[in-house]
């Protein structure tokens, strides 16, 4: 195997000229390296609203009231700790960083009593929807070189509050851990044309990989658009993603979602005078939160010249990881802000859906995404997860406790890459993991 001693110039620039060189505990919360003065001011204001706890209304703190009446978290940063990912559990109970999407077989509107997402908290005088307990089943898997690893599979128990009525007997719940936010503005700036160029929904090239776009209804434009955010690519852009998170995670209404999303049984039980009119967050503050997200920079790759990292880069491509985790994309010329335009980026994602097999399936359909299909998560910044968030919980529900465990959970379209990884020598495995941890 041949490789150059030194990385190509600029290879560490994961976000082009937006890249920041910070590998410390605040690596995920840095503004774009090329941020303008006006966007820096908006970034600072947006950061304040992202991190501060919202309070119940009415309150003397009118700029931050409107929490609930049903909610899951009090702030954006409660789940996205330091702009990173959440942790799935706290002993046997689930943490704030893990939420649950709800569904009923054959329907796309959620549970008729509890709605589309479980609200574990509520305002005074209002009943929460319930809680979830979790336990893990361990199983051992082997490698060709006789090494073994232990994988854990979560089992969830819904403890529903019958105050609003009993949920559907076939209720499904999909755990969703909060994702890291680095570089999301750059991902938003990748054109639909670029994303669709990598799609192959019918696997016409016969390589076993069938990246599929998800098309969703955009509540702001009132149009069917390409999804790119969320675990199942169910949000079109950062405005709709942010508005959905405000509403479903915190019960905060916005210009995009100006009314609470209650089920009919909840409307009968909740005092509707608690509901704000106009929306809890106005467009000016909302746009600053969106600008904050758009201007979060991806950290640079580390140790790009390390021989082990170089070998791992080659192996990443050789065993098929890069078929879905596409290393390089380019942003378009019509990005929301100038700093994001025409940037060569290295997010290691195609922003498309892939069938990952029954082992990771939750049965919940989301627009065109089936219960076993997931959007390829970006890998930039993954090696700093432990430094920033103090854990290495990966995949949509945080079941994987390491990058290796995440690889071993790959099924469906990821099966071949998992098999190829399992057959690597211990030294080659170390090189591959060193490369991924350098991102």
Describe the role of every protein-language-model region.
Residues 5-439:
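Periplasmic c-type cytochrome electron-transfer domains
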């Amino acid at each position: 195997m041949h490789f150059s001693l030194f990385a190509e110039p600029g290879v560490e620039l994961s976000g082009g000229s937006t890249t920041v060189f910070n590998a410390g505990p605040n690596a995920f919360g840095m503004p774009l390296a090329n941020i303008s003065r006006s966007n820096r001011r908006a970034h600072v204001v947006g950061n304040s609203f992202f991190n501060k706890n919202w309070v119940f209304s009415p309150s003397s703190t009118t700029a931050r009231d409107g929490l609930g009446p049903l909610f899951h978290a009090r702030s954006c940063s409660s789940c996205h700790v330091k702009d990173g990912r959440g942790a799935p559990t706290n002993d046997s109970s689930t943490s704030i960083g893990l939420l649950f999407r709800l569904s009923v077989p054959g329907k796309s509107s959620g549970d008729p009593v509890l709605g589309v997402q479980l609200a574990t908290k509520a305002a005074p005088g209002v009943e929460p929807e319930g809680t979830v307990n979790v336990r893990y089943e361990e199983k051992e898997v082997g490698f060709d070189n006789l090494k073994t690893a232990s994988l854990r599979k979560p089992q969830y128990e819904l403890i529903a509050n019958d105050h609003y009525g009993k949920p559907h007997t076939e209720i499904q719940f999909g755990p969703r851990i909060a994702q890291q936010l680095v570089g999301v503005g750059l991902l938003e700036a990748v054109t639909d044309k670029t994303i669709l160029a990598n799609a192959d929904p019918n696997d016409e090239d016969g390589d076993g990989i069938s990246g599929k776009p998800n098309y969703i209804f955009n509540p702001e434009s009132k149009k069917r658009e390409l999804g790119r955010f969320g675990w199942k690519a169910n949000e079109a852009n950062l405005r709709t993603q942010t508005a959905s998170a405000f509403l479903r995670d915190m019960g905060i209404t916005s210009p995009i979602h100006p009314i609470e999303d209650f089920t009919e049984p909840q409307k009968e039980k909740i005092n509707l005078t608690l509901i704000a009119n106009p929306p809890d967050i106005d467009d000016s503050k909302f746009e600053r939160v969106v600008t904050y997200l758009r201007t979060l920079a991806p950290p640079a790759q580390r140790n790009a010249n390390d021989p082990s990292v170089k070998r791992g880069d080659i192996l990443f491509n050789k065993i098929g990881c890069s078929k879905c985790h596409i290393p390089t994309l380019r942003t378009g010329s019509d990005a929301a802000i100038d700093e994001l335009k025409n940037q060569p980026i290295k997010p290691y994602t195609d922003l498309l859906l892939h069938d990952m097999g029954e082992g990771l399936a939750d049965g919940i359909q989301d627009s065109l995404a089936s219960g076993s299909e997931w959007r390829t998560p970006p890998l930039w910044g993954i090696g700093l997860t432990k430094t920033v968030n103090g854990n290495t919980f990966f995949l949509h529900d945080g079941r994987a406790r390491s990058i290796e465990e995440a690889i071993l959970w790959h099924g469906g379209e990821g099966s071949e890459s998992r098999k190829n990884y399992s057959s690597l020598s211990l030294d080659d495995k170390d090189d591959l993991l060193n490369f991924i941890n350098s991102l």
